[in-house]
Amino acid sequence: MTNKRKSAKPLEPAKRAPKPRTKKSRDLSASESNCDFVKVTRAGLHSRNKHQGRYDFAKLTQALPSLAPFVIKNPKGEASISFSDSTAVKMLNKALLSAYYQVANWDIPAGYLCPPIPGRADYIHRLAELLEGEVKGKFPHEKVQALDIGVGANAIYPIIAICDYRWRYTGSDVDPKSIESAQRIADSNPVLQGQLELKLQDQSQHIFQGIIGPTDYFHVTTCNPPFHASAQEAAFGTQRKLDNLAANRLKKGVTAKAGSQKISKNKPILNFGGQNSELWCQGGESSFLKRMANESERFAHQVLWFSTLVSKKDNVRPLRKQLEKLGVRSIRVVEMSQGQKVSRFVAWSFMDKQQRGEWIKLRG
């Protein structure tokens, strides 16, 4: 009788000994397991955004008759303006703020950023939505204390939030002229009086330090950080945008009606303008975000939700990883798309859901 030999089991590859974890990897894995991360994409403008669809130029010119000379017809015969014309863009903003926010006295110094209002409004509405998710029932928006880092000469975020939600805002900036301009806007419009406080950040190396006092508490912070790493890079970006606008105008064959201003290379470009502090900082956006994240840890219990816009998508992941290492408990990435344009903000809190609920109960 032939003995049957049992087939030998295939040799298993030798298991490698696990690599000893460094302090960095231990910290990161521990913080990741405790961090509540959510990313959402929102298509179209928020339902509360007052700027759905095309601009109502009949309403806008009624609110600001001086806008009328800048209104043109596009190839479809629809009313528009030349978005390459800095004066036209500024007039459009003045009309929008007057017609929809009861801010009739708004102006900015020459050479300062003139922001697109619909997109700026969406940032505020999405943040309001974030706060509303913290409670059951109606959220007490009138009790919200907000902080805008880099309020600028235009004060656009406080204006929208105050007029739509009655938030109380503190606006900070490193530029004295921006603070003066924002203060004039606050003082000359009844709807803003008593709702907006301006603070000069006289330590340009800091973001929150020197602005958030020991007894200050904020439900949310907002920021549109400088994007470029140098003045030369900022100027190049501005010229590229202007070239693209000029090419689009030629392609579409847009014609201006009589009396409207024409584009001139010698005119100040306010819509793509901006001072140094508005456009660039050493190291660019990524460096600014890193400083903001590091400094936010110091005020972990004084701010419910920190937030900032992030222009460059590639900067989101490094910011998230850094926040996780700092021990942040909750991170939200909200992408906002309007047509082909996509913007995003990152919000973070050093408190978990239960702690945030207790924070709100304590401070309203």
From Swiss-Prot:
Domain of life of the native organism: Bacteria
What is the designated name of this protein? Ribosomal RNA large subunit methyltransferase F
Chief location of this protein? cytoplasm
InterPro entries, per database record: METTL16/RlmF, rRNA_lsu_MeTfrase_F, SAM-dependent_MTases_sf
Q: Where is this region: Disordered?
A: 1-30
Q: Which HAMAP family match?
A: 23SrRNA_methyltr_F
UniProt keyword Cell membrane present: no
Q: Where in the cell is it found?
A: Cytoplasm
**Species name:** Vibrio vulnificus (strain CMCP6)
UniProt-listed PANTHER family:
RNA N6-ADENOSINE-METHYLTRANSFERASE METTL16, SAM-DEPENDENT METHYLTRANSFERASE
Which spans are transmembrane here? none
**What Gene3D superfamilies has UniProt attached to this entry?**
Vaccinia Virus protein VP39
What are the GO MF terms of this UniProt record? 23S rRNA (adenine(1618)-N(6))-methyltransferase activity
